[in-house]
């Protein structure tokens, strides 16, 4: 494709403006949780793969953790296996866990790996069971209604929480010029499999690697105030206040708590970004504009 002089000039300007950011992040690790609309639109999927390859090409080390809830739901439906959710968590019995492993560790993971490699990257697909990458234990879930005097412990099956990350494996892959793509399946002490929220896995991976950034792709423009305005930059103290006054609630709470834990655990910053925007990851890294909410570990 031949660019016009005007287009070529604009292209050169964009590259020039990105240079300070490239210099700043060369050699740094960025953990990106990939999910939502960005995984469903063919255009956005291709754009994401190209963005990841570009990051690696300029010396930044991306590590991808992906979700796949809709794809799991589709296969369960085709197999006539009912899905049940409690407080937003999929109840995962042994039969459902088999499907989760098939979809996340197989179909979804390999399609992402293939697309990145198709655009010039060297991606390698992993689940948390590979070399004990994501160690886990059964999540103890509770539920309480106003009528209860104490919380009720509920069994949601093979749903887990992260207890450890094999950072050495990921560092070896990154230094070998590979792009790790991780399915959020954990392994227990006895080799049992656990279905883990992808945001939580991404956060723990970012902490273990002391990543420069944790980036969570979502289907919203970012965190919003009660008037619907996007909050572009927040400290951990401000986030705590927004949770306390009810501005942040419901399905966003686990994502935000994951971001808070990451920055409090040594990650330089966490970003809640709009995955519906083309090239969202590059816009957030290489421009002042951004496409979401930045959270830093500040008390101001």
Curated annotation (Swiss-Prot):
The residues forming a coiled coil are none
Report the Pfam families cross-referenced here. AA_kinase (PF00696)
Matching entries from InterPro entries are given as: AceGlu_kinase-like_sf (IPR036393), AcgluKinase_fam (IPR004662), ArgB (IPR037528), Asp/Glu/Uridylate_kinase (IPR001048), Glu/AcGlu_kinase (IPR001057), NAGK-C (IPR041727)
Which pathway does it take part in?
A: Amino-acid biosynthesis; L-arginine biosynthesis; N(2)-acetyl-L-ornithine from L-glutamate: step 2/4
Listed GO molecular functions? acetylglutamate kinase activity; ATP binding
Q: List the disulfide bonds.
A: none
Function, in words: Catalyzes the ATP-dependent phosphorylation of N-acetyl-L-glutamate.
Which source organism? Answer: Stutzerimonas stutzeri (strain A1501)
Superkingdom of the source?
Answer: Bacteria
Q: What is its EC number?
A: 2.7.2.8
Family statement: Belongs to the acetylglutamate kinase family. ArgB subfamily.
Its localization reads: Cytoplasm
Which keywords fit this entry according to its UniProt record?
A: Amino-acid biosynthesis, Arginine biosynthesis, ATP-binding, Cytoplasm, Kinase, Nucleotide-binding, Transferase
List the residue(s) that the UniProt entry marks as the site Transition state stabilizer. 33, 255
UniProt lists the gene as argB
Give the residues the record marks as binding substrate: 68-69, 90, 195
Query: Mind telling me what this protein is named?
Result: Acetylglutamate kinase
Instruction: Kindly report, in one word, the top-level EC class recorded for this enzyme.
Output: transferase
* Annotated Gene Ontology cellular component terms: cytoplasm
